[in-house]
Amino acid sequence: MAEQTLKEKTAKGLFWGGLSNGVQQVLNLVFGLMLARILDASDYGMVGMLAIFSAIASTIQESGFTAALTNQKEIRHEDYNAVFWFSTLTGVSFYLILFFCAPLIAQFYDKPELIGLSRIVFLSFLFGGFGIASNAYMFKTLMVKERAKIDIISLICSGTIGVLLALNGFAYYGLAIQTTAYIGIGSMLKFCYSPWTPTFLIDWRPLKSMFRFSSKLIVTNVFTQISNNIFSVILGKFYSPRQLGFYSQGQKWMGMGNSFVGGMINGVAQPVLVQSVADKDRQRNMFRKMVRFGAFISFPLMFGFAFVAKEFVLIFLGEKWSSSVLFLQIFCCWGAFWYLQSLYTNLLISHGKSDLYLYGVVINSTLQLLFIVCFSYFGIYFMVVGFVIANVIGLLLWHIIINRVVSINLFSVIKDIIPVSYTHLTLPTT
């Protein structure tokens, strides 16, 4: 009965995750095309310069508590309550710190306009803290349907706000307010939808036990965010906002395709894998099913997107975005395999191996930076190629780490993805 129940939860989660991500991608497509038609590359570049600060602060604010709470077998109200107040107070603290650091950020990039812009973008920390505990509750209990509704409503509201502001000449401020509105509306709805509610009787003791697990996740995720956003810093500092804007657009549209696949799988992967952690054979089978399912969706989507990237950009975004085509094609090559890295890390976290997760991320991030530096002599596009090569090599590293924990044969994983990948790699040439 427990097996059937878990299968039903997984199927339901994949269905609602797929439906939610499908609708979100359509909405992102509509709003993204509208904004790209109205704004130019430098507007996206201005917001992109702040990406690394937002990513690192959000990671520290979340502190790995969602994963820590999901891994706990017995959870009390006090656990969620401690996380709620910690994330809320951390959000307020980060906003105040970054509010006063805004002039220093603007000075680093030599862009005085970033002072006001950053203070709007960083409001997302303030709003985001209110929804972390509620999101963790909904994630652990597989409330995928409710989370889907929240994401869609938040996207519609924030996208409409962004387009209206862009039409009225707010330029990059429209993008900043759109992002902040999305997080704010999402946090409010999670707070309302979640059956759990906070109280003022605060007990900080649960955080101590969670920090033993989550502290490594914090460091890990900070490394991940630095490696993912290092291009934004390099291009913002040494190149123009326009170049950063082209890079951001290429990464953005690839990310939308990735989000469709990753959203379906990540919405259920860790909770489901945690519930089968005691039976490694069963967990291996579930993992391989997710690998095959991900390959079936990811390879045709990402390789197909790379094949039509030029036509997509010229027809839907316009000639002014033609310089983002090659970025998009390069990123799509890595995007086809990205879901595998996500599955590996989810499997590792389900076993509570945050130390091995940290080890893998640090090595992978170091590898990325090494390849970026080595390829930087040849220009921006080669730097992105180096980034992709490093990530593909990193998949082998992740498998070696996972094999120590669960004993998954590398050739089994290759056998799961080769038929699908071969079909879709050769399809454009037939």
Residue spans of the language-model regions?
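Interhelical loop/hinge segments that connect adjacent transmembrane helices in multipass membrane
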Residues: 1-6, 10, 145, 188-229, ...
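Interfacial transmembrane-helix starts/ends
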Residues: 10-11, 45, 76-89, 118, ...
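Alpha-helical transmembrane segments of multi-pass membrane transport and lipid-handling proteins
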Residues: 29, 85-110, 116, 160-164, ...
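Membrane-interface helix-loop junctions in multi-pass transport and translocation proteins
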Residues: 34-51, 103, 107, 115-116, ...
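Helix-loop junctions and terminal segments of transmembrane helices
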Residues: 59-77, 138-140, 198, 250, ...
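Membrane-interface junctions at transmembrane-helix termini in multi-pass inner-membrane proteins
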Residues: 68-77, 127-153, 168, 173, ...
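Conserved small/polar residues in nucleotide/adenosyl-binding loops
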Residues: 423-429
